[in-house]
């Protein structure tokens, strides 16, 4: 039984008993037993564990987890302490520096964002080592779409940051006029220069939150 230790438990309990999820669970059980899978089994739902539904102010959507050793720990774009900062996150930090004058930290551990209400959600929550997108189409997308739909139903305004075509596909799930979505190309080095750099999404997010009487995010990740 999955225990998230916050309000997500009640919200998702029916979802975890749906046929698609039970099938996904069986697939994962076999994958974890026979192959190297990231993140660690106990880290899969860290995004939900660190950011309760009631606390969600911002959603940053990723695709699937990092597939290198020691990187993924259940939050989009974040890596574990002591691991080299991946290129996409380097570009996120560069944009934060240019946008809000944040100092570029020496780590990619984004838990301080999650603890302030930034849900760092990948649309697929597991991956085989070294094989990007290897767990696509197994059922994760149904669950994460449901999570996005639930956040869409929130009364309190939420900012959605949708970077790249995969994330932008989720715009169709966002029907609540109280929320706002900012879109751009992905921060990957392959595309960042075509519109991510200079997007100012972080200052725009805080401006929107403040306009709605919500405490803004302190985007500065401390160096360790």
From Swiss-Prot:
Its main location: cytoplasm. Pfam families: UDG (PF03167). PROSITE patterns: U_DNA_GLYCOSYLASE. It is found in: Cytoplasm. It catalyses: Hydrolyzes single-stranded DNA or mismatched double-stranded DNA and polynucleotides, releasing free uracil. InterPro entries: UDG_fam1 (IPR002043), Ura-DNA_Glyclase_AS (IPR018085), Uracil-DNA_glycosylase-like (IPR005122), Uracil-DNA_glycosylase-like_sf (IPR036895). Excises uracil residues from the DNA which can arise as a result of misincorporation of dUMP residues by DNA polymerase or due to deamination of cytosine. This is Uracil-DNA glycosylase 2. It comes from Listeria innocua serovar 6a (strain ATCC BAA-680 / CLIP 11262). The gene is ung2.
């Amino acid at each position: 039984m999955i225990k998230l230790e916050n309000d997500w438990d009640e919200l998702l309990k029916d979802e975890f008993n749906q046929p698609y999820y039970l099938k996904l669970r069986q697939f994962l059980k076999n994958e974890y037993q026979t192959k190297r899978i990231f993140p660690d089994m106990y880290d899969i739902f860290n995004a939900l564990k660190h950011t309760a539904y009631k606390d969600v102010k911002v959603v940053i959507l990723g695709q699937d987890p990092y597939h290198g050793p020691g990187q993924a720990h259940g939050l989009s774009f974040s890596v574990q302490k002591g691991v080299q900062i991946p290129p996409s996150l380097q570009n996120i930090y560069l944009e934060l520096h240019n946008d809000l004058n944040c100092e570029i930290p020496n780590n990619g551990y984004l838990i301080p964002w999650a603890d302030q209400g930034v849900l760092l959600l990948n649309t697929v929550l597991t991956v085989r080592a070294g094989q990007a997108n290897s767990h696509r189409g197994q059922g994760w997308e149904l669950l994460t779409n449901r999570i996005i739909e639930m956040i869409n139903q929130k009364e309190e305004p939420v900012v959605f940051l949708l970077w790249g075509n995969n994330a932008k596909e989720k715009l169709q799930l966002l029907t609540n006029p109280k929320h706002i979505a900012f879109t751009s190309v992905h921060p990957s080095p392959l595309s960042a220069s075509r519109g991510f750099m200079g997007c100012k999404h972080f200052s725009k997010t805080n401006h929107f939150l403040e306009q709605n009487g919500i405490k803004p995010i302190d985007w500065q990740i401390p160096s360790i």
